[in-house]
Amino acid sequence: MAQAADFVIPSAAYAEKDGTFTNFEGRVQRIRKAFEPIGESKPAWQTLTELGAELGLAFSYNHAEEVFHDLAKEVPAFRDLNYKKLGDQGLVWNKP
């Protein structure tokens, strides 16, 4: 498939990045990097931050936790959440 593409953006697999995910019931859980990304892969937040900088957009993140912090500020269901509150088991967010 990559041979047919004009460009390829390598993205890190779930075990290669830190961050969060939200499942179907609204449980928000941490994911923690188990090993370094392969080749030129990097977390999506990092790729989008770099692309945004090239486009002159005013956001700059250095870690997945900073992205989650901004998500919590902007999305009401995540408003009171942070990495510390999520702990090891995660939390179910308050559905509006």
Q: Where do the language-model regions lie?
A:
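Non-catalytic alpha/beta scaffold blocks inside enzyme catalytic domains
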Residues: M1-L81
